[in-house]
């Protein structure tokens, strides 16, 4: 009795289904596809080969998975949270408390108690257009953050803090007050 060598496939099976001749090969109990569909086919003088259609390791969530950058995006507090204004994010609360200890002024204290004076209710144009804009903010999208959000290096030196005025005003109707 002739047995195939190690690693070779068993002879193909032919089945007639509704007038069509269906042929497939089986290796180790798994169905294989001919190279006409799965590979290069007859291009370049290749032999007729069979390709294993099993998925390789690590392809389970390759297409449908989305990586949520929760840790990355939580570094930058948004002007309006998704909870409807009931409570701000934990990062914003912690940063406001730290800011009030270093530079106690009424805007920071009011923002921590719940009054929404430090962060505006309206958004600038294009503030949340996608993940790319969070990492590369357009100069036209100014979030109007309060003075307590300035870098600590400016407040440690005791220098006069410059007034933040955007180059292109987000709100053309409002005029700067002198």
From Swiss-Prot:
Q: Could you tell me the keywords of this UniProt record?
A: Apoptosis, Cell cycle, DNA-binding, Nucleus
Q: Say yes or no: keyword Cell cycle present.
A: yes
GO biological process terms, semicolon-separated: apoptotic process
Clinical disorder: Cowden syndrome 4: A form of Cowden syndrome, a hamartomatous polyposis syndrome with age-related penetrance. Cowden syndrome is characterized by hamartomatous lesions affecting derivatives of ectodermal, mesodermal and endodermal layers, macrocephaly, facial trichilemmomas (benign tumors of the hair follicle infundibulum), acral keratoses, papillomatous papules, and elevated risk for development of several types of malignancy, particularly breast carcinoma in women and thyroid carcinoma in both men and women. Colon cancer and renal cell carcinoma have also been reported.
Per UniProt, subcellular location reads as:
Nucleus
Write down the DNA-binding region ranges. 8-50
One GO MF term on file is: DNA binding
Reply yes or no: does the keyword Cell cycle apply. yes
Please give the name of this protein. Answer: Killin
